[in-house]
């Protein structure tokens, strides 16, 4: 699963997830892409589950790029532990996503296969997404 190899600090503040995606909004590598329409937090497990769904559908053809990386640690205190005594341990890693952010890209397959693969991937994600193609200028 995706997570940083090392970080400067073990735990982070929760923070806010506001605004629109300024970077990562263009189709850079592939021909087709899956773009976020909502804001939310994608866990490393959700990113991996969507990737597996896509790769199973396209089989051996095509290439997939994952354009998001879970770099925010989420902490949780153990069950039945009273409040206080410091912050809990890191439970999992998330990626904060704003509307307009490209999540996955794909090339080397037909548009119908790409649409179906992204539809399967979108079912694994907790946010609304949209299928986009690269625009040639």
Swiss-Prot record:
SUPFAM superfamilies: Ribosomal protein L16p/L10e (SSF54686). InterPro entries: Ribosomal_uL16 (IPR047873), Ribosomal_uL16_bact-type (IPR000114), Ribosomal_uL16_CS (IPR020798), Ribosomal_uL16_dom (IPR016180), Ribosomal_uL16_sf (IPR036920). Signal peptide: none annotated. It comes from the Bacteria. One of its GO terms (biological process) is translation. PROSITE patterns: RIBOSOMAL_L16_1, RIBOSOMAL_L16_2. GO terms for cellular component: cytosolic large ribosomal subunit. The keyword Kinase does not apply. Keywords: Ribonucleoprotein, Ribosomal protein, RNA-binding, rRNA-binding, tRNA-binding. One of its GO terms (molecular function) is structural constituent of ribosome. The keyword S-adenosyl-L-methionine does not apply. Belongs to the universal ribosomal protein uL16 family. Binds 23S rRNA and is also seen to make contacts with the A and possibly P site tRNAs. Part of the 50S ribosomal subunit. This is Large ribosomal subunit protein uL16. It comes from Thioalkalivibrio sulfidiphilus (strain HL-EbGR7). The lineage of its organism: Bacteria, Pseudomonadati, Pseudomonadota, Gammaproteobacteria, Chromatiales. The gene is rplP.
């Amino acid at each position: 699963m995706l997570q940083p190899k090392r970080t400067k600090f073990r735990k982070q503040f929760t923070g806010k997830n506001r605004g629109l995606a300024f970077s990562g909004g263009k189709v850079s590598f592939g021909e087709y892409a899956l773009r976020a329409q909502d804001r939310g937090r994608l866990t490393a497990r959700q990113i991996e589950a969507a990737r597996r769904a896509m790769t199973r559908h396209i089989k051996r053809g095509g290439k997939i790029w994952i354009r998001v990386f879970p770099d925010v640690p989420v902490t949780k205190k153990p069950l039945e532990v009273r409040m206080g005594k410091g912050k809990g341990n890191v439970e999992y890693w998330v990626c904060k996503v704003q509307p307009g952010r490209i999540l996955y890209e794909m090339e080397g397959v037909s548009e119908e296969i790409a649409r179906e693969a992204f539809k399967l991937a979108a079912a694994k994600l907790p946010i609304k997404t949209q299928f986009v193609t690269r625009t040639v200028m």
